[in-house]
């Protein structure tokens, strides 16, 4: 037998299909036009004209960038006609090869036919010669992955509520003959009411009974054993296995199968053995035995899983059943009347809805039926009759039908408070007297956007690329869950920051699959410090107080990298029951403990090359281009990466550091030194006059790390003092908001984050919000914890 080719180390910025080492090649974005009305004159009222200086795409006013990759970026936007917030994914088609484009349009086609309350909704598709814009649902709760990092495992009642929604949505996809193939905690998002939204259909495909699929898709810890064996599969059964891993992760806060390299992980998956923690109920254990079955033929179907006892505890009168999609409500008179006042013709509205065009007309109709945005404290409602407060309605659906999975969902913030979402309600909900903005002229993407893209280039050190997997998710803070926080669940069993983000494999040919998955003898993941493209979520993102661009990750630390790891369950006092048979021996704990109180963990680092996204020929190309000889040591990997990036890294670093002021820690605040950008008080000069300014109030308080009754201005000064003491660069962008940088990009240890002083709702307390912008979670956790602990508030 010939020797297997070692797994190559792949740059984090490599896309799944073709690679640009230098990152995103910027192209000018031409003026966009609505796909349905190009020359209709539209008028603006005073509100839209006041914001004309902001860039627009179609009817969407672009706001901040919430994620980016080499060939795409995602921006938070507001629909100027309705005031609803959306996420706009902007994809540079000129950077994609034909295969990538084909998969991108397959993803769009699949999303158009999905209409489930627990699946991210596509609103509008705008296409120009060089650019594709996907307007999608914006979720404000972030990823389930980051929720678990911040809070630890869920109680089974909470996990059940989430898992019922997940199963309902996945079974709905299977009804439509669609298999997701990349189900994992990173691709499960939370909306404003903490309900599940399944994202990232970049690896999904349509399946036909009797026709086998053969592409390896998914993150290895979530991948079914038949994928590791290179066998062909029908489709749904690989999703069922992934759901078993997800359920285990929700309930235990760790992965059932993990390893220090792919070979070890593969062996554990093929054994099918996992440890059952003592706190897991027998019913939950029995459900896992139906999901995590090695033989795909004997693996339970989702229809059977829906009837499982654990799934329906507390829901005995409303057993989970397959989702019955209501008929589309295409004749909501109130919404149509409002659209007519905006300048749409009734025939145009009817044609767009009947034909399902996903143009500006259909998007406006859908958005009018969605839940209006909720304003945070301090933001004036007078910033628009762009939106209204009304009883939620159900998008296009005019039916009281709903899946039982959507009922009795407990808010994670308040475990006893029952929440309903807009999609659970039916019927029109828009008061006819409400004033909406008329349609503005279709504006081009203004120069501000281009400038921002150029400015954001400085952060591409940690960004990942986007091909057909171009959707980016922003999420809540990943970091330690401080006990001082005034809100948060009480079921934490380990400190935050212990979970590891999983990237995604794709191998389309058996030779690639075996080379990538069966090899692993020497490719210990602890030896690979180069990061790769993440299998990303949807373009939905977290709301302001808890948002973090998911794609913006730095390379892992070279030399002696400290890895973020999942916790192993302690032996000793904790009793375990075997999973399906014998226990899997516990993996050796990481040599780098996160803290003294952190449990032992198995190492499976974020962004290692063995978590890369591979596609057929590109795997072989990368072997020859990025790898030669035996597996490299950390220093070898880093040297290769540094050589590949040397042409751009220096300029990028200088751009980053030139924006910040680094002070000698010995000088501190007592030196009285000020720079040209700041007044004597240390506040930005243009902010000094607004002494009456107050911190904004947060809705989600679980991103708070420290609370205090101190004056917010004094808190900002204390934060700056601690940042100076830790040699952190920072820029005070707003009165209570600091953009911070720490580490050396040339050593792949650069971390960027925001610190903001915010007010806690209904309490006379202020808190410090940490939001990671880029860098590995362990590097961020280390510096954020150090700063939080040194703050004297």
Swiss-Prot record:
Residues 1-40, 377-499, 517-697 are annotated as: Disordered. Transmembrane segments: none annotated. SMART domains: S_TKc, UBA. Keywords: ATP-binding, Cell membrane, Cell projection, Cytoplasm, Cytoskeleton, Kinase, Lipid-binding, Magnesium, Membrane, Metal-binding, Nucleotide-binding, Phosphoprotein, Serine/threonine-protein kinase, Transferase, Wnt signaling pathway. InterPro entries: KA1/Ssp2_C, KA1_dom, Kinase-like_dom_sf, MARK1-4_cat, Prot_kinase_dom, Protein_kinase_ATP_BS, Ser/Thr_kinase_AS, UBA. The lineage of its organism: Eukaryota, Metazoa, Chordata, Craniata, Vertebrata. Interacts with MAPT/TAU. One of its GO terms (molecular function) is phosphatidylserine binding. Highly expressed in brain and spleen and at lower levels in kidney and skeletal muscle. It comes from Rattus norvegicus. Phosphorylation at Thr-613 by PRKCZ/aPKC in polarized epithelial cells inhibits the kinase activity. Phosphorylated at Thr-215 by STK11/LKB1 in complex with STE20-related adapter-alpha (STRADA) pseudo kinase and CAB39. Phosphorylation at Thr-215 by TAOK1 activates the kinase activity, leading to phosphorylation and detachment of MAPT/TAU from microtubules. Phosphorylation at Ser-219 by GSK3-beta (GSK3B) inhibits the kinase activity. One of its GO terms (biological process) is regulation of dendrite development. Its cofactor is Mg(2+). Residues 523-547, 585-599 have a biased composition (Low complexity). Gene3D superfamilies: DNA helicase RuvA subunit, C-terminal domain, Kinase associated domain 1, KA1, Phosphorylase Kinase, domain 1, Transferase(Phosphotransferase) domain 1. This is Serine/threonine-protein kinase MARK1. Residues 380-403, 462-473, 487-499, 647-657 have a biased composition (Polar residues). Activated by phosphorylation on Thr-215. Inhibited by phosphorylation at Ser-219. Its EC number is 2.7.11.1, 2.7.11.26. Changing residue 219 to A/E: Loss of activity. Belongs to the protein kinase superfamily. CAMK Ser/Thr protein kinase family. SNF1 subfamily. It comes from the Eukaryota. Serine/threonine-protein kinase. Involved in cell polarity and microtubule dynamics regulation. Phosphorylates DCX, MAP2 and MAP4. Phosphorylates the microtubule-associated protein MAPT/TAU. Involved in cell polarity by phosphorylating the microtubule-associated proteins MAP2, MAP4 and MAPT/TAU at KXGS motifs, causing detachment from microtubules, and their disassembly. Involved in the regulation of neuronal migration through its dual activities in regulating cellular polarity and microtubule dynamics, possibly by phosphorylating and regulating DCX.
